[in-house]
Amino acid sequence: MDEMFDKLQAVADRYDELNELISDPEVIADTQRFMALSKEEGELRETVDKYHQYQDVTQQIADDDEMLHDKLDADMESMIKDELKELTAQKAALEEDIKVLLLPKDPNDDKNIIMEIHGAAGGDEASLFAADLFSMYSKYAERQGWQIEVVDENATEVGGFKEIVMMITGNKVYSKLKYENGAHRVQRVPVTESAGRVHTSTATVGVMPEEEDVDIDIDPKDIRTDVYRSSGAGGQHINKTSSAVRMTHLPTGIVVAMQDERSQQQNRAKAMQILRARVYDYYKQQEESAYNAERKSAVGTGDRSERIRTYNYPQNRVTDHRIGLTLNKLDRIMNGELDDIIDALIVSDQAAKLEDLKNNG
């Protein structure tokens, strides 16, 4: 506990220093520095507020304890004891909140994301489920006030997607959607099933932080770029020049094709953006594989082959297998009401990290 309070005091001291700095006219004149310091101050504010609440509650407990040593009438003594019970519970709750706030932050949590959804096992039904997941995440993003841009899609004749890639931008997108990595299983009666039998299909979801200024060096010699003519349906803008771009990262074999933009330069920029994210994600998965072999985190490894969730339509049920959470409101979840699942995953992840901290110091 002493170590925790040393950390808290250091955070509080830094917070006070930041408040002085962002009031300094010289700092205010330097827009970039002012914004960086304001962001840091905002990130520390909740922790410092909780620390001050903790100090206040601790002082109130000490004052009440001292009063109990005085001669009191029965009613006053009973009232103080009741207050002490309440304050002790508040103190314990604040300690837990502070422990969570002091956990190491995921450096990617504030980032935007690139999300890929692939129809996997199940043919047409899997592609339709991929479209349903796209709709679910789009509605969730709308509820969060985030923006979605589809950057690539491979539609099927039945109205589904073999693959759809989108960028989601907004406040702390990765912190909430990083838990969606994995295989999503659906159990339902396909519209084409005349006998009414329930079929099982899967779609995979990949979530990667957008890496514009990523700490990863991609040697231009490691990228092969091919250009070709865009294809499009009748009535769409079709380039007569070679504006479509296919980039291959030779060391990993990762391929990105882009033809949605109107110029080769725009397609190159968008393809490079997605390639950087995929290459970063590839190496991140490689680094984490050894750790995950020793200890699977509460929310899974993030491996896209890992089945993380089942959506059972006949029973209106969604089960997240990583934390054993079952919710009987599939209709609302598919309408973008994901908060109950995501909040539970965050709490479970934090609990696992606290346990790790306790066991490994």
From Swiss-Prot:
SUPFAM superfamilies: Release factor (SSF75620). One of its GO terms (molecular function) is translation release factor activity, codon specific. It comes from the Bacteria. Its main location: cytoplasm. HAMAP family: Rel_fac_1. Belongs to the prokaryotic/mitochondrial release factor family. This is Peptide chain release factor 1. It comes from Levilactobacillus brevis (strain ATCC 367 / BCRC 12310 / CIP 105137 / JCM 1170 / LMG 11437 / NCIMB 947 / NCTC 947) (Lactobacillus brevis).
